[in-house]
UniProtKB/Swiss-Prot annotation:
Part of the twin-arginine translocation (Tat) system that transports large folded proteins containing a characteristic twin-arginine motif in their signal peptide across membranes. Together with TatC, TatB is part of a receptor directly interacting with Tat signal peptides. TatB may form an oligomeric binding site that transiently accommodates folded Tat precursor proteins before their translocation. It comes from Neisseria gonorrhoeae (strain ATCC 700825 / FA 1090). It comes from the Bacteria. Residues 135-151 have a biased composition (Basic and acidic residues). The gene is tatB. Its main location: membrane. One of its GO terms (biological process) is protein transport by the Tat complex. The lineage of its organism: Bacteria, Pseudomonadati, Pseudomonadota, Betaproteobacteria, Neisseriales. It is found in: Cell inner membrane. This is Sec-independent protein translocase protein TatB. Belongs to the TatB family. One of its GO terms (molecular function) is protein transmembrane transporter activity. Residues 206-228 have a biased composition (Basic residues). Residues 106-164, 196-228 are annotated as: Disordered.
Amino acid sequence: MFDFGLGELIFVGIIALIVLGPERLPEAARTAGRLIGRLQRFVGSVKQELDTQIELEELRKVKQAFEAAAAQVRDSLKETDTDMQNSLHDISDGLKPWEKLPEQRTPADFGVDENGNPLPDTANTVSDGISDVMPSERSDTSAETLGDDRQTGSTAEPAETDKDRAWREYLTASAAAPVVQAVEVSYIDTAVETPVPHTTSLRKQAINRKRDFRPKHRAKPKLRVRKS
């Protein structure tokens, strides 16, 4: 802290020895050491405070720069948001609104329900349309069609090909085949029951064997009598 050399320190010590004397010199040296220690601690605390203030100032500058950058980014995002909203408004204004919504088709329009099954009304209408035709009309129409077919066949009979001939032979052979009557087969067991000879069961045989192995004469235990 103080730029003192060795010669200067020796000179100061000699002057203090002459002025204070050998009795008070040790106490004065201790007091001077305490003062110098306090002064050094004070200087160290001042340096630490200065360093802290410098660091805080640097941090404050960094914080301000960061806040400025964040504000710029926020402003740019706001500008882009406004631009996008303006462009969307322009696009929506340019579109023509629908005068009316298009007609929505339902499954009932196609004759089925939500699960894809045909509706009962449509099935009934189809069956009614088929049943409306009278049997006499059916027979008349069938007769007319047969008559037309015969007339057309009599007027123009095409030449029979090999394929048609093979089909005709196959059909006539299948029609002329004899009908085989089905033979009924009963699955009821008709075997004659034969009488089974009477035999003892295995359990009874085992019981009889155990009885045979038992000793016939059991030894009686002998009782001891204490002699008094």
